[in-house]
Curated annotation (Swiss-Prot):
Miscellaneous comment in the UniProt entry for this protein: Might carry two S-adenosyl-L-methionine binding sites with only one binding to the iron-sulfur cluster.
Descriptive protein name: Heme chaperone HemW
Entries under NCBIfam families matching the protein: hemN_rel
Gene from which this protein is expressed: hemW
Organism taxonomic ancestry: Bacteria, Pseudomonadati, Pseudomonadota, Gammaproteobacteria, Enterobacterales
Chief location category: cytoplasm
Subunit details: Binding of the [4Fe-4S] cofactor promotes dimerization.
Species this chain originates from: Escherichia coli (strain K12)
Amino acid sequence: MVKLPPLSLYIHIPWCVQKCPYCDFNSHALKGEVPHDDYVQHLLNDLDNDVAYAQGREVKTIFIGGGTPSLLSGPAMQTLLDGVRARLPLAADAEITMEANPGTVEADRFVDYQRAGVNRISIGVQSFSEEKLKRLGRIHGPQEAKRAAKLASGLGLRSFNLDLMHGLPDQSLEEALGDLRQAIELNPPHLSWYQLTIEPNTLFGSRPPVLPDDDALWDIFEQGHQLLTAAGYQQYETSAYAKPGYQCQHNLNYWRFGDYIGIGCGAHGKVTFPDGRILRTTKTRHPRGFMQGRYLESQRDVEATDKPFEFFMNRFRLLEAAPRVEFIAYTGLCEDVIRPQLDEAIAQGYLTECADYWQITEHGKLFLNSLLELFLAE
C-alpha cells in the first residue's frame, strides 16, 4: 500500500484573444464569442467521469489556467466552481487560483470571480516595456498591467502573482532589471520570473528572434535574483519567488509529486492508487472535439522503471530538501532501486544526503539536466 499524495484540480480554459508567438500552451485564438455556458457544462461532465479518482481525498488546490481564463464571464465562473464544490470535497482553506491577462481585466469581473470562490489571481504581465510587449504579441500595455495588479491588490485576495519574463528579444540587463523593479513596486506576494525559451511549433520557433547570449542571461539572473532577495522575496523553485508564507500551493503539489485531476481541453492528470499504480491522463486538445463530448484523449500507467525520474524531475526544481520517506511513500519503490544513481549524484556533487532527506546543491542546480539524466530508465 502506498500513501496517497495530496490532491489538486486543474481546469483548462483554451481560448485567447490572439495567440502569442512564444506560446506553446494549448491555446486557441477566439473566433466570435466564448461559449461560456456550454463549455462549463462540458467541464463538469468531464469532471463527472474523473470524480472517482479523488478516492475520498479533499481537494487542496484548484488552478484555472489557459488560454485566458479571464475571458470567462463572472456567472460562468460561479457555475463552474459551484459545480466543482457539488462534486468534490474542497479543503476549508483551499487555494483557488485563476490566470488573468491584463488586456481582459474588468473590475466588476474580478469581483465576480472572487465571489465565485477565487482567492488568488495570477496576472500575465511578462514585461512593462511597450516595445517588448509588442514583440511578444501581447494585447495589453504597461499601464493595463499595472492597473490589473492594483485591482488584484485592492480586492483583498489571499494572494496574487505577477508573471514576468526575462531574456527577451534584444533585452539589455538594465531593461530586464527595470521590469523587475516595476513589478516589485506593485508589491505582489508572489513573482514568477522565468526566462523566455524558444519552443518548436510556435511563431518564434519558425522565425527565432535574437535573444541575449548566455553571459548576458547569467548577469540578468544574478542581478535580478539579488534585487528580488533584497526586496524580501525568497526563491523556492527555479523560476518562483514569494514573500514568506505566499508560495503557490498548487504548483508546490505538482513539484512534490502530488496528484491532480485535469479537466478541460488538453488538461493533464496524475492519479495514484492504493496498490501503487500511477495513472496519467490527457484530455482532448481541440475545443471542437472536446465540446462534442470526446473528453479523454489518452491514458497510461507509469512504468515502475520511470517512477524515479518522474518523482525527481519536478522535485529537484524545488530548493527545499526532498524527504526520503516521500520517495518510498509516493512511488511504492524502495531506495535500493536508485542507490547506484544516488551514489553517482552525490559523487558528482549534485546532491547531499542525510538520514531524512536529499538536498540539491548549487552545483546540482547548475547541472540539473545532468542530475536528472542519472534517473532516466535504461
